[in-house]
A protein has these predicted regions:
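Conserved, well-structured functional cores that handle cations and Mg-NTP chemistry
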Residues: 1-140
Length: 140
């Protein structure tokens, strides 16, 4: 049985939630919200991007398939339904997510390495090229 955190929750741990909440307060994003907050919306849309979902319906099907793991992915305890997600996407201020994206890009630019040799520790290179191997088997 898996004892570690899921990869998605490990990725979202790098997001600065305090800064995101500042943008939510600035644009009053969680006003009149009962359960599906701006943070939940951000994580839901990130999950859709990272899992290569093509539509909202496809994303909701994926959430239903992972309903038991939804809390551990960081998406909360309540199921995410298409109507709620589409309403949030339509009515919430996009500037919350735009400003947060610009903030994250600024942080990434400041922390990037200009020379790979300056990074401490071991360096690994992964090659994902595929090769075609032609084999013939002769039966006698």
């Amino acid at each position: 049985m898996n004892q570690d955190k899921y990869v998605f929750s490990q990725l979202t741990a790098f997001l600065n939630r305090t800064q995101f909440n500042n943008y939510v307060r600035k644009y009053d994003g969680d006003r009149y919200v009962k359960q599906f907050t701006c943070w939940n919306q951000l994580l839901a849309m990130m999950f859709g991007q990272l899992s290569n979902r093509e539509s909202l319906r496809d994303l909701i099907v994926a959430f239903e398939a992972h309903r038991g793991k939804q809390y551990h992915l960081g998406l909360g305890r309540n199921p995410i339904v298409k109507a709620t997600l589409s309403y949030a996407n339509q009515n919430r201020n996009y500037r919350i997510f735009e400003d947060f994206a610009f903030y994250m890009m600024k942080e990434a630019c400041e922390k990037r390495a200009t020379n790979i040799l300056d990074i401490p520790g071991k360096k690994y290179a992964f090659d994902s090229t595929t090769t075609f191997a032609s084999m013939t088997v002769t039966v006698m």
